[in-house]
Amino acid sequence: MFKWPWKADDESGNAEMPWEQALAIPVLAHLSSTEQHKLTQMAARFLQQKRLVALQGLELTPLHQARIAMLFCLPVLELGIEWLDGFHEVLIYPAPFIVDDEWEDDIGLVHNQRVVQSGQSWQQGPVVLNWLDIQDSFDASGFNLVVHEVAHKLDTRNGDRASGVPLIPLREVAGWEHDLHAAMNNIQDEIDLVGESAASIDAYAATDPAECFAVLSEYFFSAPELFAPRFPALWQRFCHFYRQDPLARRRENGLQDEGDRRIVH
């Protein structure tokens, strides 16, 4: 179990969290020992700074809390935990939840409807998740609800709303937008050809630039082999922004055998 000297007087108990057990999930299996240590330190700080609020009778064990914190910190591992400033609570439902959604169509009419959501990220408010999809985010499958919502938070640091362009130098914005829209068009072409269910990238990525950035961030961290060869130029932009290269990391450190990568509950 990791123990941090700088947290010796911490009354929160985060220094005694089951960090090593929390690391035993496929999406984190390729991290080096140095990266694991850094992620653990960052996750401990995350739990100091944020409040995880379990809703509707859900109970979060210390292991659950540790893994949630690690997934939040993975995208900002090299950016710094300050990139997660701007919210103080993470609300967690047991399962996907129903919300009242309001939206305006192309001619200005406002519509209201009840929709099922997996997660939400409010610009100046909490992140909302559900436990069923958080558990699915432990796998290296291309799906990661936590990374998706963190990407939206990072996206909105660049302005009033999520645009698909995170906080990058102004000189890089045009190239980013070009490559992102090219990826959206490519994904839509595949959907038109084979259908949403058979598409190799989640069809949600084709809906708008903000969702494309969030969905591809999921693949960036949990299924880089599906992202990098298909969109090499955009892949390099993601590597530059996140200051990580999950595909190179995976090749350098190697993935453990399936028997060694089982999730410990």
UniProtKB/Swiss-Prot annotation:
The record's free-text note on cofactor binding: Binds 1 zinc ion per subunit.
Family annotation (Pfam families): Peptidase_M90
Keywords (A to Z) from UniProt: Aminopeptidase, Cytoplasm, Hydrolase, Metal-binding, Metalloprotease, Protease, Zinc
A GO-annotated cellular component: cytosol
Major localization class: cytoplasm
Compartment(s) of residence: Cytoplasm
Molecular function via GO: aminopeptidase activity; metallopeptidase activity; zinc ion binding
Segments traversing the membrane: none
Annotated consequence of substituting H111A: Slight decrease of peptidase activity
Family: Belongs to the MtfA family.
Comment text on domains: Zinc induces structural changes at the active site. The holoenzyme adopts a self-inhibited conformation and is most likely not productive.
Subunit structure: Monomer in solution. Interacts with Mlc.
Name this polypeptide is given: Mlc titration factor A
Annotated organism of origin: Klebsiella pneumoniae subsp. pneumoniae (strain ATCC 700721 / MGH 78578)
Lineage: Bacteria, Pseudomonadati, Pseudomonadota, Gammaproteobacteria, Enterobacterales
Protein's gene: mtfA
